[in-house]
């Protein structure tokens, strides 16, 4: 049996780039909660002792941007300079303007147009991916890397590993074989964790705690063997972290946000963007399409692409590839997809209820992945049953 290695990485919520994603989406949530028609393009950057929010926002909402920044940083765990940022005393800079009237007139008309008439907020192409290798219909390498990051945060916040600090990165290499186009995991080849820690803990304590409290609860035993390699804080020291260690910027972790390097990516980031931005809404609808294809048994693995022109409601193209795992030809799967999914941006917002704010809805997406999550707010993860002729197949 010929196998290959594939690696996916993740970062947890204290990573500077992810801090910025969370601030941007917290701003989006606040705007949508008061005004579902808010037009939001919110970027965030951070460095030592400073967080800045900037961009274009047109909303009727009354939003305290500085308070959102401080609350978000505090909830992550940035409560002192020692851990990388002091949420209550850092500098907060705000430079928010209204959306360009050129873009607004060419795209939205959202107060007068019907949802099906609303044009795309920009050009671009987005990809959705699904695979039957995990219950989430997501790649195993990505799922494990993401869950390790989430577990790091959990044991930090609940006090199990009190020496942990907010910043951290994970990476998992999985050995696969290709089963006629379907990806079949064989074993976990390598686990890498680099996590920020306090001054008191030893490297041996770090390694022991990570194996016991992070790796063991996350990675199923069947994937681990005596040959599995563990790199646990291999640099030897990671005390300085968060924005004090590295600058951060919204939209710098787009592969972590999606499929861990599997499938494809059109390049557009998600966080801080309202649903008229097809970078986000387009990626959500093609994930639902790909997931529904696999869940309905049409294919074991597939990718769906959609593309748009600014101001035009109808997509320019829709593409499906089942990697040879389809039970029926890809052209037939594409026909089913077009019959069951409405790719017009206004209708995506309606069908996935994307204008609904509150409950930290989009903030939740900004760490630990936008896909493969069991949460009623992740409406794009709801499988749409697809009818097809199994006898003919």
UniProtKB/Swiss-Prot annotation:
L-methionine binds at residues 56, 99, 246, 277. Mg(2+) binds at residue 9. K(+) binds at residue 43. Catalyzes the formation of S-adenosylmethionine from methionine and ATP. The reaction comprises two steps that are both catalyzed by the same enzyme: formation of S-adenosylmethionine (AdoMet) and triphosphate, and subsequent hydrolysis of the triphosphate. ATP binds at residues 15, 167-169, 235-238, 246, 252-253, 269, 273, 277. One of its GO terms (biological process) is one-carbon metabolic process. It catalyses: L-methionine + ATP + H2O = S-adenosyl-L-methionine + phosphate + diphosphate. Its EC number is 2.5.1.6. Gene3D superfamilies: 3.30.300.10. The gene is SAMS. It is found in: Cytoplasm. It is an enzyme of class 2 (transferase). The keyword Cytoplasm applies. It holds the Pfam family S-AdoMet_synt_C. This is S-adenosylmethionine synthase. Binds 2 divalent ions per subunit. The metal ions interact primarily with the substrate. Can utilize magnesium, manganese or cobalt (in vitro). It comes from Litchi chinensis. Pathway: Amino-acid biosynthesis; S-adenosyl-L-methionine biosynthesis; S-adenosyl-L-methionine from L-methionine: step 1/1. HAMAP family: S_AdoMet_synth1. GO terms for cellular component: cytoplasm. Homotetramer. One of its GO terms (molecular function) is metal ion binding. Keywords: ATP-binding, Cobalt, Cytoplasm, Magnesium, Metal-binding, Nucleotide-binding, One-carbon metabolism, Potassium, Transferase.
């Amino acid at each position: 049996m010929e196998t290959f290695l594939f690696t996916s990485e993740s970062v947890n919520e204290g990573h500077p780039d992810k801090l910025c994603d969370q601030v941007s989406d917290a701003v989006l949530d606040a705007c949508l909660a008061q005004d579902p028609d808010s037009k939001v393009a919110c970027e965030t950057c951070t460095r030592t002792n400073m967080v800045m929010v900037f961009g274009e926002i047109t909303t009727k909402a009354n939003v305290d941007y500085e308070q959102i920044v401080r609350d978000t940083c505090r909830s992550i765990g940035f409560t002192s300079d020692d851990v990388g940022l002091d949420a209550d005393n850092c500098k907060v800079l705000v430079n928010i303007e209204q959306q360009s009237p050129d873009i607004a007139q060419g795209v939205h008309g959202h107060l007068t147009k019907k949802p099906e008439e609303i044009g795309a907020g920009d050009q671009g192409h987005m990809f959705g991916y699904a695979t039957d290798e995990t219950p989430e219909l997501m790649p195993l390498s990505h799922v494990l890397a993401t869950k390790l990051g989430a577990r790091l945060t959990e044991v930090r916040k609940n006090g199990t590993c009190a020496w942990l600090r907010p910043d951290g990165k994970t990476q998992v290499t999985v050995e696969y074989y290709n089963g006629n186009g379907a990806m079949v995991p064989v074993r976990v080849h390598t686990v890498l964790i680099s996590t920020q820690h306090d001054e008191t803990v030893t490297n041996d304590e770090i390694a022991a705690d990570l194996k016991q409290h992070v790796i063991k609860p996350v990675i199923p035993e069947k994937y681990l063997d005596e040959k599995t390699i563990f790199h646990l804080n291999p640099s030897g020291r990671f005390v300085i972290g968060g924005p004090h260690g590295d600058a951060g910027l919204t939209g710098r972790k787009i592969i972590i946000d999606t499929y861990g390097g599997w499938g494809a990516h059109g390049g557009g980031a998600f966080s801080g963007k309202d649903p008229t931005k097809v970078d986000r809404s387009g990626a959500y609808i093609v994930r639902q399409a790909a997931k529904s294809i696999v869940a309905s048994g049409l294919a074991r693995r597939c990718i769906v692409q959609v593309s748009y022109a600014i101001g035009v409601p109808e997509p320019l193209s829709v593409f499906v590839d089942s990697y040879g795992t389809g039970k029926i030809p890809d052209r037939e799967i594409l026909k089913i997809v077009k019959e069951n999914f409405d790719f017009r941006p206004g209708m995506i917002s309606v069908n996935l209820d994307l204008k609904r704010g509150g409950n930290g809805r989009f903030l939740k997406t900004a760490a630990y992945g936008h896909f493969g999550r069991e949460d009623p707010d992740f409406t794009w993860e709801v499988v749409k049953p697809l009818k097809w002729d199994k006898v003919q197949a």
